[in-house]
């Protein structure tokens, strides 16, 4: 069996990635989220596949087909609730995974980091088109508002929006193509995740100290497989608790009403995981400026490796940068809260302040703190 595991062309790849992989001996529970994201993706693809068997991508039938899944399909309610709340778990793990990457300096593996940012964009696109499918009020108006942002692009904006809609408004053709995108994109994510892993295994994992761990490595199995199973058990427990006891806690009540183009909901807002970006978008009064700020809020992740000024990789021994990191985290919580509030004072000014602070910490304060810490470490004699 050992020979087969180590010599068979296909098994060898699996063995080198998940069994005999040399891993640093000191990686903490923050390194669990990669495997949790993989499990989330598989869960979403499986539950999504069963939902797609019963879903009808037609404006007259979409809402009813989702109700039919919940009422008449065996365990349809559970599959639907697992899929909807699975998206929330996915983003929770994703944001913690990115946060860990920033805190411990994992972004210095540039190829892995860049593929990760592309993955983030793809997951966000998938979640957005998926949210439109139940064809409730918030689905319809969310699709209308977000696709309309492209009309801010000079010259080609309006044409581009109508091209995406497949008509002069969000309608049947929009829903059909969004369903097609939502079906294909998870497989693109799967392919990108494999490339992400490929680049990671070129260098090996980083560790909390940020020091080269080559002198002290242990096999991935059984040490980290057991550790990952613990994280997985906790995540599945939280997901099942959500799906079974309060499946609608993270959703929007407006989505229980079928889409009505003649009636606009009082507060159009996306799911909780997009609220921080939505707050940044709304904090700029100009439409094009808002769209650019929205893009910049995610694209700025690509600049983080270039803004690294410290001699140390991790924030473990850098108290000033640590403080800034936690201020940034608190700022993102504030932005998430503001994104769910109506556009009125004092929310407008809080959102604008939080948006400025977000960019300021990443572009100016963190690099300055790195330089200061580097200076403080220089011998003064």
Curated annotation (Swiss-Prot):
Gene Ontology MF terms in the entry: metal ion binding; ubiquinol-cytochrome-c reductase activity
Transmembrane segments: 33-53, 77-98, 113-133, 178-198, 226-246, 288-308, 320-340, 347-367
InterPro entries named among the record's database cross-references: Cyt_b/b6_C, Cyt_b/b6_C_sf, Cyt_b/b6_N, Cytb/b6-like_sf, Cytochrome_b, Cytochrome_b_C_euk/bac, Cytochrome_b_N_euk/bac, Di-haem_cyt_TM
Topology within the bilayer: Multi-pass membrane protein
Listed CDD domains: cytochrome_b_C, Cytochrome_b_N
BP GO terms, sorted: mitochondrial electron transport, ubiquinol to cytochrome c
Subunit-structure text: The cytochrome bc1 complex contains 11 subunits: 3 respiratory subunits (MT-CYB, CYC1 and UQCRFS1), 2 core proteins (UQCRC1 and UQCRC2) and 6 low-molecular weight proteins (UQCRH/QCR6, UQCRB/QCR7, UQCRQ/QCR8, UQCR10/QCR9, UQCR11/QCR10 and a cleavage product of UQCRFS1). This cytochrome bc1 complex then forms a dimer.
Keyword Mitochondrion: yes
Function noted in UniProt: Component of the ubiquinol-cytochrome c reductase complex (complex III or cytochrome b-c1 complex) that is part of the mitochondrial respiratory chain. The b-c1 complex mediates electron transfer from ubiquinol to cytochrome c. Contributes to the generation of a proton gradient across the mitochondrial membrane that is then used for ATP synthesis.
Note: Heme 1 (or BL or b562) is low-potential and absorbs at about 562 nm, and heme 2 (or BH or b566) is high-potential and absorbs at about 566 nm.
Pfam family, one: Cytochrome_B
Keyword Heme: yes
Residues involved in a ubiquinone binding: 201
Domain of life of the organism encoding this protein: Eukaryota
Family: Belongs to the cytochrome b family.
PROSITE patterns for this protein: CYTB_CTER, CYTB_NTER
Any Gene Ontology CC annotation: respiratory chain complex III
Entry's cofactor comment: Binds 2 heme b groups non-covalently.
Main localization category: mitochondrion
Name of protein: Cytochrome b
Cofactor(s) annotated in UniProt: heme b
